[in-house]
Amino acid sequence: MAIFNHLPSSVLQCLAIFLSIIIEALPFILLGAILSGFIEVYLTPDIVQKYLPKNKIGRILFGTFVGFIFPSCECGIVPIVNRFLEKKVPSYTAIPFLATAPIINPIVLFATFSAFGNSWRFVFLRLFGAIIVAISLGILLGFIVDEHIIKESAKPCHFHDYSHKKAYQKIFYALAHAVDELFDTGRYLIFGSFVAASMQIYVPTRILTSIGHNPLTAILIMMLLAFILSLCSEADAFIGTSLLATFGVAPVVAFLLIGPMVDIKNLMMMKNAFKTKFILQFVGTSSLIIIIYCLIVGVMQ
């Protein structure tokens, strides 16, 4: 098109990077949205309650790893966890699920594998980091602090009961939820891709390099970026890989870990469902563990 001939080369480069990120991430967003829709309809708190172990440690581990079997996008995880808590699933089981389900599920792990050039390195770093955070939160809630974390006057989180619907109705609701999920997460992907592309083209390399030289500063910057961008976990690896050359391994791992656990949209939903004291404990504990973990990753490179 003739209009592109009049655009500066920097704009064209930015558009090329922007579109490449979108095209790479879109299939995973679509697959994740469809899966999220079926999880919303078919996975009930009663099913989770049925298979809970009897002891606390077992329940903490169950909450940590069940996300691999019953994955859920972080965009809809808070209402699901709130429903679990209302059904008397212990907080030390539900909150580890909140932390790991958007990260350890097969779609996100495969997206991470694909985004980083078919490398298992970031898959394992992301997986182990999420497990460490989840188990730590479970121990905190199970043995140290008051486990009652739901607001007494919490507003409903729009978790619908589909158990009495007919089979075709369940499929319809699952697909309808998938469409909503796709449009909801798509806007964050577009915004995140634009920011990542713009940073690579318009932010002077010397500034980014100076930030990247200080490991702690780089980790904090990437955590803040993940919080602001509020990307879906199926897509954040594609943003992370575009910033790898600038910031390095440890800050990108921090970006991949904190985003699905603590971002703007999640915080707003948590504020609606959970006590402020718990939210501060969750954010503080998660952030501190991720910082320490990523500093260790940086030293071990």
Curated annotation (Swiss-Prot):
Disruption phenotype: SMU_746c-SMU_747c deletion affects biofilm formation in a medium- and pH-dependent manner. Mutants show a reduced ability to grow in acidified medium, but they survive both short-term or long-term acid stress. Mutants have lower glycolytic activity. Deletion does not affect membrane proton permeability.
Cross-referenced Pfam families: ArsP_1
InterPro entries: DUF318 (IPR005524), UPF0718 (IPR052923)
Transmembrane segments: 15-35, 60-80, 97-117, 124-144, 188-208, 211-231, 238-258, 278-298
UniProt keyword annotations, A-Z: Amino-acid transport, Cell membrane, Membrane, Transmembrane, Transmembrane helix, Transport
Domain of life: Bacteria
Keyword Repeat: no
GO cellular component: plasma membrane
Topology versus the membrane: Multi-pass membrane protein
Keyword Transcription attributed: no
Subcellular location: Cell membrane
GO biological process: amino acid transport
Complex and partners: Interacts with SMU_746c.
Biological role stated in the UniProt entry: Could be part of a two-component membrane permease system responsible for amino acid transport under low pH. Involved in acidogenesis, biofilm formation and low-pH survival.
Family: Belongs to the UPF0718 family.
The protein's name: Putative two-component membrane permease complex subunit SMU_747c
Organism: Streptococcus mutans serotype c (strain ATCC 700610 / UA159)
